UniProtKB/Swiss-Prot annotation:
It comes from Tityus discrepans. This is Toxin Td2. Residues 1-20 form the signal peptide. Belongs to the long (4 C-C) scorpion toxin superfamily. Sodium channel inhibitor family. Beta subfamily. CDD domains: neurotoxins_LC_scorpion.
Length: 86
């Protein structure tokens, strides 16, 4: 029983390390993925497409996702390229 509990703890720790990224989904243009005119479930669906566990439309402007893999590109103010072309 002790080994099983230890196994579960290790499993959850690995899951937290592997998929711990959260942030705004970014489109191909470098901008946040807009959700202003989308249905309520749009962001949750978009987040699950990139293997995130959940997401919502933050202030009705942009999709924010939780627990995404590290390979997913997210919008960051420091590296913002939105509106500057490719």
């Amino acid at each position: 029983m002790t080994r099983f509990v230890l196994f579960l703890n290790c499993f959850f720790l690995i899951c937290m390390v592997v998929e711990c990224k959260e942030g705004y989904l970014m489109g191909a243009d470098g901008c946040k993925r807009s959700c202003l005119t989308r249905p309520g479930h749009y962001c949750a669906n978009e987040c699950s497409r990139v293997k995130g566990t959940d997401g919502y439309c933050y202030a009705w402007l942009a999709c924010y996702c939780y627990n995404m893999p590290n390979w997913v590109k997210t919008w960051d103010r420091a590296t913002n390229t939105c509106g500057r072309g490719k």
